[in-house]
Amino acid sequence: MTESPESGAMMPIQPGDGDVWRSMPRRNTQKVSHLLAADLRHQILTGALAADQQLPPEADLTKRLQISRETLREALRILESQQLLEIRRGRGGGAVVRRPGLEAVSRYVALLLQLRSTTLEHLEEVRSVIEPAAAGQAVGLAGTGHLKTLVALHDSERSAEDDPLGFVTAITAFDQAVTELAGNQTLAVIAGVFRDIYAGQVYSSIDSKDAVAADQIARRVIVSHSAFLDAARRRDASLAQKTWSDYLFTTNRLLVGRKVSRRPIDIAPLWRAQAGQAGTGPTPRRALILAAEFRARIAEGRLKDGDRLASLADLAEEFSISRPTLREALRILEMEYLLDLRTGDRGGASIRTPSSRVAAQQAGIVLEARGTTFADFFRATQQIMPPIIGLAASRITPTRLKMLDDVSARLAACTENTSEFITTWREAEMIAFSAVKNPALTVIAEIMHWVRIGVEPAVTADATRLPWVAKTNRNAQRLFAQFVAAAAEQDSVGAAEVWAENLKANASWFQESGFGERLVLDLMG
């Protein structure tokens, strides 16, 4: 929707004669609905269709695009499932463009992590890998306006100290703002996803009957953020990084003192609290509350993959809710890839548990919407992956080491076949990352792996035309063999250094090939 400068009211955009509403080509290779969804998706992500714009009425679109209602509705459902559209019902409703944010990705990944028995200790390790370096980088890039924003966010923390949900929301906003200032979109997305999950555990700790412990945690956060602001004002990146590391260490120790560090995370209390405070909006509050309840039951293991829900009639009676509101709640879960709906009340619905591949799809959409380049993605890889590899080497098991030896031999056999080499390399990475024995770090590696899989066809197609690519493959295989040797000695420092060296070599490859400056959106197609 567009905004009227006189009234501030939201008005739907109108179909014009431009390319936005051109009729769809008729091709036999793909369904027209999928072509339309892909076309609109590209226009949303490139800004041709802006956030909060309302698409023209269904009748206008079908006429303009020369398609059926069923085809249009299927295309819009695809975009809704990708969090790029919101379908509003009732008078004044319609399809409204959305800018995908971190909320949906965070919620999905949190559910995935809880089902993998992730603990608070695992999340602490994730933060220690990602955040301190980003905090130091942020200080070097922060201007006066940025510092004022951080001060305002810090003031919000102070004012919300006695409100557990408000306080957790405020500290999450401050921490995310610091990471955003580091200037790497990929890092900001990944850190933001896991920070929201960590915040859920902080909420559980401070929203308790132990008022003294809750007050200690709140005060420690406020003092730590004040110290970081002092370092930022001095433009001291080293001090800022140390301050952030101390912040993570001290707050984590307070939580450890309450003997929760090794317990599996439980995100359900925060979800229920957030749903209970949902305001008025296009989605009924009862629908949001019910969707949160189903989400929580999946997280708690009460609903498992493939479980069938009761009929609409039985569910409506169980929750004392109207069928339209119930259907809206189920649609929310369907759009989050947590439910398979069937036509008709008797068909029921079945539960889908989350996967890292779907999480990567959701994260990829957010990266695309932010205009992330492949160079940005690769810089995040250079910062995150060596520490993970170092931890994996220090925790390697004989079985995993044997798998690494085998895949190293396969890499040596296919250095002249770039397409096969890249595919084998991705498999080798997954074996290495799985050795870290931290489900949260493994999920990060898997998400980045699946994003790379998305751009792999474009990378492979161009790489095969470069005359020196076989030499690059041989060098990568040599370094991987050195990593395996370091892992055999459980040499975490050596393994991390070898991995960093390999990534540095790849960085020059991307610069030479021109991939670095291309958008993730364009590479993923």
What do these predicted regions represent?
Residues K31, E125, L165, Q216-R220, ...:
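Short helix-capping and inter-helix turn/linker motifs at the boundaries of alpha-helical repeat units
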Residues R41, L45, A135-V139, V151-R158, ...:
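Regular secondary-structure segments
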Residues S23, E70-R73, R77, S81-L84, ...:
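Extended, hydrophobic interaction surfaces within ordered domains
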Residues R127-A133, Q137-D207, K242-N252, F377, ...:
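Conserved amphipathic alpha-helical segments that form helical-bundle/coiled-coil interaction surfaces
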Residues E336, K437-N438, W450, L466-A470:
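Intrinsically disordered, low-complexity segments enriched in Gly and acidic/Ser/Thr residues
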Residues M11-P15, Q201-P282, G301, G454-G525:
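C-terminal all-alpha effector/ligand-binding and dimerization domain
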Residues M1-E125, P264-A380, M524-G525:
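Short linear motifs at protein or domain termini
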